[in-house]
């Protein structure tokens, strides 16, 4: 309702009040107006009104006054306004009575009531809009979305669990209650199917035993995961035969059995199901080798450095060998010299036509031993004269006495000629001036030999 229309309505109501008073006193107005005013006298008693009916009647009054202003008929507008005011007496009784004094203050009071109603309606609309906005904000909040996702995940996992359990073996009851325990396993149906498979019915929720320590309490505390088997998943490693599977995050772990529409049954091994559901996780050999260490790059660097250090040590140990070989003469030169020496030994030893290296060397060794024994035999009488070392001299004498005959025989067999001492006067110095006039010989006279032979 516009402010201009309200002022116009107030003016019209004032005119209506003045015309009604003049018509009741003078009786000079229009007959229709006179009949309306005379037939229905105004009473000062209380009239029960409602703000809703008042607003409806005010709208009728505005329409009537606008129509009469266009026709420029003031008398008709006064009569219509009187008839509209007269209609207030026919309103039903409501909850609260309101006194109706027919003056300008009453209309102002009702106008205030209308304003209060409009304010209340606008406030209720704004509160309703704010409530709707708050409700939408609550729906869009991450807490509600997480809760809805968790509920959907629970429903989906329960359906998958029922499907896999029903495909694997019969179950009494549903998944909403706990799985059949020892009390329910004694039923006839469970006993009848007990011989067909060797599975064990768990009596507790598996998801309560397989909660990960690495999962945060804010994100995944309310999610129940049946068949989240805690073998080596939450340690970050899964072994599939001899193949090392890389670590999973929480979402991949929760969706292990969901990619093909059913979870693995209890009878099948876990890695067999992984071979079906995770073919894309077969990694290269280099990646598998990197997964054995917590820090692959640092371990590879350490291995490379270690290999380089070992190679450097081996090279350092091999260098002196190479230098020693280079310092020696070539192999051909050594072979030629050895051949010449072997030929010289063959001429000295004369191994009876044997020209091979082994026989020549054996004959040379035997000849050297023979020469050593002869030197020892000839030096025995001279060693007796030295009294400084009696122990050693006695040992030598005993050895010479034991092998005297054998050695002499050996010398004779070898063709050694023994010269008599009389003939060796130039050596011993026993004779006169013979033998070059040398008075003293090179060798002293042995004590046991007194005369010549």
Curated annotation (Swiss-Prot):
Residues 1-37, 177-197, 386-411 are annotated as: Disordered. One of its GO terms (cellular component) is nucleus. The keyword ATP-binding does not apply. One of its GO terms (molecular function) is DNA binding. Residues 322-371 form the bHLH domain. Keywords: DNA-binding, Nucleus, Transcription, Transcription regulation. Homodimer. This is Transcription factor bHLH110. The gene is BHLH110.
């Amino acid at each position: 309702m516009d402010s201009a229309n309200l002022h116009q309505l107030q003016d019209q109501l004032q005119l209506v009040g003045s015309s009604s008073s003049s018509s009741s006193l003078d009786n000079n107005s229009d007959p229709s107006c006179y009949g309306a005013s005379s037939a229905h006298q105004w009473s000062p008693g209380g009239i029960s009104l409602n703000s809703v009916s008042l607003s409806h009647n005010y709208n009728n009054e505005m329409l009537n006054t606008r129509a009469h202003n266009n026709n420029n008929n003031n008398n008709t507008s006064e009569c219509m306004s009187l008839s509209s005011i007269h209609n207030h007496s026919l309103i039903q009784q409501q909850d609260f009575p309101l006194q109706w004094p027919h003056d300008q203050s009453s209309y102002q009071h009702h106008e205030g009531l209308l304003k209060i109603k409009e304010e209340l309606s606008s406030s209720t609309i704004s509160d309703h809009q704010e409530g709707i906005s708050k409700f939408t904000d609550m729906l869009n909040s991450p807490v509600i979305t997480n809760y809805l996702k968790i509920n959907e995940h629970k429903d989906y996992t329960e359906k998958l669990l029922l499907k896999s359990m029903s495909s694997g073996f019969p179950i009494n009851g549903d998944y909403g209650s706990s799985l059949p325990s020892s009390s329910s396993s004694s039923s006839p149906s469970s006993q009848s199917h007990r011989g067909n498979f060797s599975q064990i019915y768990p009596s507790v929720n598996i998801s309560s035993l397989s909660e990960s320590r690495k999962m945060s309490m804010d994100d995944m505390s309310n999610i129940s995961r049946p068949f989240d088997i805690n073998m080596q998943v939450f340690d970050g490693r899964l072994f599939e035969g001899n193949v090392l599977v890389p670590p999973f995050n929480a979402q991949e772990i929760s969706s292990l059995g969901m990619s093909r529409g059913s979870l693995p049954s209890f009878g099948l091994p876990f890695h067999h199901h992984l071979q079906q559901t995770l073919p894309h996780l077969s990694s290269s050999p280099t990646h598998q080798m990197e997964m054995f260490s917590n820090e692959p790059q640092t371990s590879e660097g350490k291995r490379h450095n270690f290999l380089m250090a070992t190679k450097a040590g081996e090279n350092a140990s091999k260098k002196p060998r190479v230098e020693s070989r280079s310092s020696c003469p070539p192999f051909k030169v050594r072979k030629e010299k050895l051949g010449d020496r072997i030929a010289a030994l063959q001429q000295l030893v004369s191994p009876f036509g044997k020209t091979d290296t082994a026989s020549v060397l054996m004959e040379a060794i035997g000849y050297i031993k023979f020469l050593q024994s002869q030197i020892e035999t000839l030096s025995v009488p001279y060693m007796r004269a030295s009294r400084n070392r009696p122990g050693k001299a006695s040992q030598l004498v005993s050895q010479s006495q034991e092998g005297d005959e054998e050695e002499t025989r050996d010398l004779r067999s070898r063709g050694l000629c023994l010269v008599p001492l009389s003939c060796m006067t130039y050596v011993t110095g026993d004779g006169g001036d013979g033998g070059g006039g040398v008075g003293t010989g090179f060798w002293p006279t042995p004590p046991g030999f007194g005369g010549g032979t």
